[in-house]
Amino acid sequence: MRLLLLLLVAASAVVRSDASANLGGVPGKRLKMQYATGPLLKFQICVSUGYRRVFEEYMRVISQRYPDIRIEGENYLPQPIYRHIASFLSVFKLVLIGLIIVGKDPFAFFGMQAPSIWQWGQENKVYACMMVFFLSNMIENQCMSTGAFEITLNDVPVWSKLESGHLPSMQQLVQILDNEMKLNVHMDSIPHHRS
């Protein structure tokens, strides 16, 4: 019983840390260029899809070419239902592994006969725990993967992988930024008339 209580406490800590995780892996941390004062280029990316390296490369090149642009990056969160499913699976996985290790039959609690897969799991605890762990992680990762690589400049969308279906090349991104910067300079130079 103590082991089950310990597993529940550990699972709630995992859920809280997963819910607050940001791009850097540290709760509340965002990757950003701290000292620039110009326009804000914001990346919202799917970290679990492996886009963090792409973001870091783009950030390096853009910060060299446009030193005045502030760059921020954060994880693009999936829809709340998928986040809740992933959190539930994270807790359920730990409870199920705990029950397998302890050898308690949860089906007896409900007055049901244990299925053959549960009996197999009791006979092969290591394999059963590994299978539960890896299958649950696979489903959790699928729920948390968005495939997003969204870019905004001063809160105006300039690229969306969700809409276009592919990442921008470095040349495309530089061309988009050049056009946006020229447009902003042009708009700032137009005299404003008072009525």
From Swiss-Prot:
- Kindly list the places in or outside the cell where this protein is found, as annotated in its UniProt entry: Endoplasmic reticulum membrane
Q: Which GO terms describe its cellular component?
A: endoplasmic reticulum; endoplasmic reticulum membrane
A single GO BP term for this record reads: response to glucose
- Main location (coarse class): endoplasmic reticulum
**What keywords are assigned to this protein?**
Endoplasmic reticulum, Membrane, NADP, Oxidoreductase, Redox-active center, Selenocysteine, Signal, Transmembrane, Transmembrane helix
Site of the Cysteinyl-selenocysteine (Cys-Sec) crosslink? 46-49
What membrane topology does the annotation report for this chain?
Answer: Single-pass membrane protein
Keyword match Membrane: yes
Q: Which reaction does it catalyse?
A: [thioredoxin]-dithiol + NADP(+) = [thioredoxin]-disulfide + NADPH + H(+)
- What Gene Ontology terms describe what this protein does at the molecular function level? thioredoxin-disulfide reductase (NADPH) activity
- Write out the PTM section of this UniProt entry: May contain a selenide-sulfide bond between Cys-46 and Sec-49. This bond is speculated to serve as redox-active pair.
The cross-references to InterPro entries, in alphabetical order and at most eight, read: Selenoprotein_Rdx-typ, Selenoprotein_T, Thioredoxin-like_sf
- Signal sequence span is 1-19
Q: Spell out where the chain crosses the membrane.
A: 85-103
List, alphabetically, the PANTHER family matched.
Answer: SELENOPROTEIN T (PTHR13544), THIOREDOXIN REDUCTASE-LIKE SELENOPROTEIN T (PTHR13544:SF0)
Q: What does this protein do?
A: Selenoprotein with thioredoxin reductase-like oxidoreductase activity. Protects dopaminergic neurons against oxidative stress and cell death. Involved in ADCYAP1/PACAP-induced calcium mobilization and neuroendocrine secretion. Plays a role in fibroblast anchorage and redox regulation. In gastric smooth muscle, modulates the contraction processes through the regulation of calcium release and MYLK activation. In pancreatic islets, involved in the control of glucose homeostasis, contributes to prolonged ADCYAP1/PACAP-induced insulin secretion.
Protein name, per record = Thioredoxin reductase-like selenoprotein T
Source organism (scientific name): Bos taurus (Bovine)
